[in-house]
Amino acid sequence: MSNDRYKSIEHRVVANGSKDRVSVPIFMNPRADAILGPLPEVLESGEQPLYKEVVYSDYFKYHLSKKHEGKKTMEPKYSDTTVKAISTVSSVLSKLCDSYISSNQYAPRDPNSEKIIDFVVNKRNGVKGLVDAGIQTVPELYILPVDERLEPNKILTTDSIPVIDVSNWDDPVVTESICEAAGKWGFFQIINHGVPLEVLDAVKEAAHRFFGLPSEERSKYWAGNSPTETVALKTSFVPQAETVLEWKDNLSFRCSPRDLESFPLWPPVCRDEVVKYMESAEPVIRKLLEVLLKGLKVEEIDEAREYTLMASPLVNLNYYPRCPDPDLTAGVGPHSDISTITLLLQDDSGGLYVRATDEDSWIHVPPVNGALVINMGDILQIMSNDRYRSIEHRVVANGSKDRVSVLIFVNPGADAIFGPLPEVLESGEQPLYKEVVYSDYFKYFFSKRHEGKKTMEFARI
């Protein structure tokens, strides 16, 4: 950060032949998703940066992927402003940390892709900036291998996920329908849920307003540059770990009661609508969890269990700008969510597909006016010992218009420990998963590109 004004010096410790020795270091570290590089104040006189911007979790994992080697972790240094191939970092991590970072199956990035990375990620323009710049073709960096594209012959038109009327939560037919859909499909839509239509429309309009701001206004909230850690603008999924980027930008809001204290620092064009939507959706979240947990023989959600289920909600405003050739790229690649449950509000564009039960096909989830799409996350699949299913889903890009969606990820507290519920195992059933700290699961998910349900192997016995 000091551009070499301050020195991080090698040090070592010798063993002791006469007595035991202890020491207690305190490492003052950045957040895992913090982006670090030379400070703007250091470079304001025109001084050239010696280091590129790096996500701390990538730097951390590279450091722990090898033996102590002096100051080797700090290499390479750069003497110009060109950001070198981030895929090189991904390649190194793949070779040295195969157990942690997924293998890189794509070719190295070409020089033009490096320029795209610089513009989209490092200059904080996002894919929205590319579209605003007038690109007419999809850059190579966004083009999927042929075998990863969603071909028409893979779309199943004879099946659909259920649409459930929840106007009477106490109706046994409603509760049975929810639990059945959670077990068979992992996805369902709910209507008559109680969130006012005007609240749903307002938060979608707010998403369009934010992404309609000039780039210099949007970039004020870029992850690592935002005035608060509770709001972060990002692009794709994890660009530093991806060799093909996703055609999406998103603005994330951490919405726990403590996080809401930083509300005045959130973007004025959308903060009121985000909070109103979260407040309106909370009763729905609680009813859904109550029904789903009762289906697992949990009669009461006490304070400790509530922390494990829903302590850290996250609201995402996802933005998919119009794409010149949507068949070549992905809005979001196939993945399952690392939430307990997720609530998705679609606009009228469509484009969400879920994995069919035959595992080789995909089912479109058509927008239903006023509906919320509900899907099970990995956490609930693990807690249910596979009774409920966290299903892969993906989003295709749109060639005719900009698309927005609004998600609420209902997440555990960072230090919550989760595993199969005792109520599920009380009859002697064997657990399929070990107990895991949520922050560890979260970090593993964000250490790699979207890879279907591979994250669940982190917890599987």
Where in this protein do the model-derived segments appear?
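Peripheral, non-catalytic segments flanking oxidoreductase cores
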Residues: 1-461
